[in-house]
């Protein structure tokens, strides 16, 4: 039976994600068991808060290796949301240099490094997202649709050969999402992004064949 695993590592209110998934017609489980991750059909890694705390929690629960093995050796699709997206990346400087899961070749840095002091940080609220053609996450979503953000750290660059990513403009171009095959991440919160967010979640789960 197909199983959607929402990773519970103590970093956010998971019920908003679970409720959104239920609203669009899917069942899911909240889990901190590595076996559930490895035996799932799709993984959702949400999160709010400190990158270092998030990685420490994943490591202490045995979830970091389970996520890597599930994605790299079993090709299980994963969607990282907000902090979850950042944890999929190579590293973050929050609060100091910390290694991530290294499933996406991206570095996370403070927004204030590239954004003028006249702009309010953290970046909070609905912001238009500029999408790539043929991105499965944004199927049936118009380019420059609004999604809900809340973050103080983010990515400003992706590798030159990346063809599937999106960005928003908040004084500087901030990476809003990035995909490498079945490994996907979004900086915004789809569960707080109204209809567009629900469509995006449905797109991910349809891509995952759950």
Curated annotation (Swiss-Prot):
Keywords: Amino-acid biosynthesis, Cytoplasm, Glutamine amidotransferase, Histidine biosynthesis, Hydrolase, Lyase
Domain Glutamine amidotransferase type-1 positions: 3-210
Protein localization: Cytoplasm
Tagged with keyword rRNA-binding: no
Active site feature: 82 (nucleophile), 189, 191
UniProt GO MF annotations: glutaminase activity; imidazoleglycerol-phosphate synthase activity; lyase activity
Gene Ontology CC, one term: cytoplasm
Pathway listed: Amino-acid biosynthesis; L-histidine biosynthesis; L-histidine from 5-phospho-alpha-D-ribose 1-diphosphate: step 5/9
Source taxon at top rank: Bacteria
UniProt keyword annotation of Calcium present: no
Transmembrane annotation, as ranges: none
InterPro entries membership: Class_I_gatase-like, GATASE, Imidazole-glycPsynth_HisH
Enzyme Commission number, as recorded: 4.3.2.10, 3.5.1.2
One GO biological process term: L-histidine biosynthetic process
Primary localization: cytoplasm
Catalytic activities: 5-[(5-phospho-1-deoxy-D-ribulos-1-ylimino)methylamino]-1-(5-phospho-beta-D-ribosyl)imidazole-4-carboxamide + L-glutamine = D-erythro-1-(imidazol-4-yl)glycerol 3-phosphate + 5-amino-1-(5-phospho-beta-D-ribosyl)imidazole-4-carboxamide + L-glutamate + H(+); L-glutamine + H2O = L-glutamate + NH4(+)
Function of the protein: IGPS catalyzes the conversion of PRFAR and glutamine to IGP, AICAR and glutamate. The HisH subunit provides the glutamine amidotransferase activity that produces the ammonia necessary to HisF for the synthesis of IGP and AICAR.
Subunit and interaction comment: Heterodimer of HisH and HisF.
PANTHER family cross-referenced by the UniProt entry: IMIDAZOLE GLYCEROL PHOSPHATE SYNTHASE SUBUNIT HISH (PTHR42701:SF1)
Name assigned to this protein: Imidazole glycerol phosphate synthase subunit HisH 1
Organism: Parasynechococcus marenigrum (strain WH8102)
């Amino acid at each position: 039976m197909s199983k959607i695993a929402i990773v519970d590592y103590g970093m956010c209110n998971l019920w908003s994600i679970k409720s959104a998934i239920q609203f669009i017609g899917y069942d899911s489980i909240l889990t901190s068991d590595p076996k559930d991750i490895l035996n799932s059909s799709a993984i959702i890694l949400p999160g709010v808060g400190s990158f270092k705390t998030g990685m420490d929690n994943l490591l202490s629960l045995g979830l970091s290796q389970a996520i890597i093995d599930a994605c790299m050796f079993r090709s299980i699709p994963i969607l990282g949301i907000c902090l979850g997206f950042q944890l999929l990346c190579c590293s973050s400087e929050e609060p100091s240099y910390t290694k991530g899961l290294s499933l996406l070749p991206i570095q996370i840095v403070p927004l204030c490094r590239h954004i003028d002091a006249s702009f309010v940080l953290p970046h909070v609220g609905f912001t238009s997202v500029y999408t790539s053609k043929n991105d499965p996450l944004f199927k049936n979503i118009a380019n420059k649709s609004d999604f809900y953000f809340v973050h103080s750290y983010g990515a400003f660059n992706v590798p030159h050969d990346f063809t599937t990513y999106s960005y928003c403009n908040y004084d500087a171009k901030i990476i809003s999402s990035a995909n490498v095959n079945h490994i996907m991440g979004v900086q915004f919160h789809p569960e707080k992004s109204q209809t567009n967010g629900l469509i995006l979640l449905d797109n991910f789960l349809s891509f995952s064949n759950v």
